Amino acid sequence: MKTINIKKLAVLPLALGLIFTSCKRYSSDFGDTNVNPGVTGSPLFNALLTNSLVAIPGYAAQTRGGLYCQYFSETQYPDVSQYSIPQINFEGNYSGVLNDLQNIINNGPNDNMKGVSRILKAYIFSTITDSWGDVPYSQALSGNGTPAFDRQSDIYTGLLTELTAAVNQLGGTGAITGDIVYGGNVAKWQKFGNSLRLRLAIQISKK
């Protein structure tokens, strides 16, 4: 029995040495094993713009106001008619498309891409303040977790100023890639931006 135990003790250090050597050999470099080939290191601005444009009809066709006024009602999801709206309906406005547009505005490849994104951002903010009134605007999308709420009148003033600057930014030589609405036509985006300015001005005149 003693001979067997001595042999086991002699083999144990060799086994441990082999284990640690093997771990050290393979722990520092796993190659591409844990690398996700579907993740990009930098944003694809054309994809961000396309994604934003696809989401725009959801803002344009909001039914919340009609439900509040009882122009029509729901059967399956009656939260809005019962004035019991999930918080995500508000917060989701800031966590999705607006972030994509802000990314293009901050890091986009040219002024035309940035100008279009500013117009779309202004449009979305107009629908947000029309739905909720006073909301975060001037401090939104800046990484501030507790942005101040701006008065709706100040938001409208800011949107008109932003749209003027956005339309003036358009007109360079940079391509508007990912544009599934106007196919990169700068003149049409300028018309849309100016039309949106007129719409907001009409709304202000009624207050």
Task: List the predicted regions and their residue ranges.
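Sec-dependent bacterial lipoprotein signal peptides
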Residues: 1-22
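Aromatic-residue-lined binding/catalytic grooves and analogous aromatic/hydrophobic interfacial grooves
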Residues: 23-28, 157-173, 186-207
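Membrane-proximal, proline-rich intrinsically disordered regions
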Residues: 23-95, 103, 107, 111
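Conserved, well-structured interaction surfaces
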Residues: 72-178
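A glycine-rich, coil/turn loop motif that links secondary-structure elements
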Residues: 115, 179-191
